[in-house]
């Protein structure tokens, strides 16, 4: 009993002493440790501030050297870094402070990381400012003071053939002006619209043997003085094209000499008259005919018929025909007749009797020379409109002689009409002639 009681008392005392020792050690640690911990934290915060100040000075020096942005973005970045450091320090004062061995290192690392992140943010702001300064340099390109019409005209005039496609025009403008080179896709449609809507530009279709895409564009020759004194800065007025046939436009556009001043066109010459006095007087555009044509021999006046020499009494009735008359002088027309005489003839022009017709009449009717001399021959007597004044004055000398003489005269008349008159003038006389011959 005594041993057990002693052992129990000893164990209880040992437990009490152990508990007291542990509590004392904790109290001692609580009393001793806070001062170094606060000192360490203050030292770390001061070091972080020094590092941040050094980074701010370096960033500010770089920005002053480059002269791109003011110091306000850098200060904002520095403030962010300081805030990160403060956050790290606050984390160290949190509940984890009761166990310093396990959490002291991570808290310091977090504080240092926060400060570094803040400094990095400030550096990023400086980089962004540098990028903005570079963008301002690109916008310094100035737009040329030329209109799209002037740019297109420049491109076409510098080409050897004075014609270009849309892609070639855009290539010239991009190579000449840097502003349009930077903004190439935006103004291509404007060039296309100006080519289509302005009359000073003419579209030329591509030749069949010339492969490629797109039509050619050239300048209208009449729009050469479109700009004042050759300056492309100002146009005089809007050019309007005159209505010209399409083939002439194409020929003038393809030929480089078409840009020179053209002489005034000459008035068209009227063709000579070919159908008597009604040809030119009534505006009939007829084809000229050869002046020596047999169909128009009646335009030239024939000389008076020669009387055959008196045949002896014993000579036969059929005499040789007289020699042909000399050819009429060329390019001479008969004088115009009055309206009454033109109305008497069926075609509106005189029909003088040829020498062959007069000779045949004399050969067929030797006894009726006085009647023929008294009354001229008329076409109305052949058509059937009525006998002539001389023929109907007295009775015929004899039935047999009259029929023979009329048949001979009809034969000679038909030959003369067939050789000296047009076919249209000889055809209407055929029915009346056949009727008179049948009556005989």
UniProtKB/Swiss-Prot annotation:
* Pro residues bias: start-end ranges: 301-311, 319-329
Q: Where is the composition biased (Acidic residues)?
A: 15-33, 47-60
Subcellular location per the Swiss-Prot or TrEMBL entry? Nucleus
Provide a Gene Ontology MF annotation, just one: DNA-binding transcription factor activity, RNA polymerase II-specific
Question: Where is it predominantly found?
Answer: nucleus
Positions of the DNA-binding region:
143-237
Output compositional bias ranges, type Low complexity: 1-14, 99-111, 402-417
Q: What does this protein do?
A: May determine the nasotemporal axis of the retina, and consequently specify the topographical projection of the retinal ganglion-cell axons to the tectum by controlling expression of their target genes.
Q: What is this protein called?
A: Forkhead box protein D1
Organism of this sequence? Gallus gallus (Chicken)
